[in-house]
């Protein structure tokens, strides 16, 4: 019997395999989620570098959110990553939800990033 962590890793691998087919050189917007926090990175897989990142562990987000593990905080992280992506010169990305459902905090982060100007 597989553990929940192994199931998550298998789902994430399945999602990333599909993303590689459609990426066409675009960087990947990768989401990592825990019970208390959420973080996101824009990764250029061809060069193997992180172009921008944002998290609920940052002082700006902690100061403006009541809690770091809710939908409101995820939306703030989405806005922050959109701003940092613009500074890094990134507009088009491929959204990598990992093994997480596109619902709740993951969806709030994605919607806020789209509102901030990222295209995916």
UniProtKB/Swiss-Prot annotation:
As one GO molecular function, the record gives:
structural constituent of ribosome
Which InterPro entries does the annotation name?
Answer: Ribosomal_uL18_bac-type, Ribosomal_uL18_bac/euk
Query: Highest taxon of the source?
Result: Bacteria
Protein's GO biological process: translation
CDD domains from the xrefs? Ribosomal_L18_L5e
- An example Pfam family from this entry, by short name, is Ribosomal_L18p
Gene Ontology cellular-component annotations: cytosolic large ribosomal subunit
Protein family (similarity comment): Belongs to the universal ribosomal protein uL18 family.
Q: How does it assemble?
A: Part of the 50S ribosomal subunit; part of the 5S rRNA/L5/L18/L25 subcomplex. Contacts the 5S and 23S rRNAs.
Name this protein carries in UniProt: Large ribosomal subunit protein uL18
Specify the species. Answer: Hyphomonas neptunium (strain ATCC 15444)
Q: Which gene encodes it?
A: rplR
